[in-house]
Regions:
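Reductase modules of NAD(P)H-dependent flavoproteins
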Residues: 1-117
């Protein structure tokens, strides 16, 4: 089923999606989320506590749209456990929420592959 929440109540239920989401997850197999980075971070955290996959469509500036300018990079943990700066325009814009290092967006985290030591 589809549940819609808008902060202003213009569609669906009024409120932030993080308010009612806990009650919706009991029979949920996967979460698809799009919106501001703060909301995606919050939903991904909730999903991780319930061990539910969360596909997050990030809203990142994509100046060139083909990966050359590197303005859309995000720190994402790979299947090998290594953090890499990935381009959301070419390798995304959808990422597993538990793999994005939400607190490190806008910088290169320590230990990132190819990053400063």
């Amino acid at each position: 089923s589809l549940s819609i929440f808008t902060e202003d109540g213009s569609m669906g239920t009024q409120g932030r999606v993080t308010d009612p989401i806990q009650g919706l997850l009991d029979n949920t197999d996967i979460i698809y989320a799009c919106g501001p980075m703060g909301m995606l971070k919050a939903i991904s955290k909730i999903a991780a506590t319930k061990e539910i996959p969360c596909q997050s469509a990030v809203e990142e500036s994509m100046a060139c749209g083909i990966g050359i300018c590197m303005t859309c990079v995000l720190p994402v943990i790979g299947d090998d456990g290594v953090t890499r700066m990935v381009r959301s325009c070419t390798e995304g814009p959808i990422f597993e929420g538990s793999k994005v290092r939400w607190d490190e967006i806008g910088r290169v985290p320590p230990g990132t592959y190819g990053g400063p030591k």
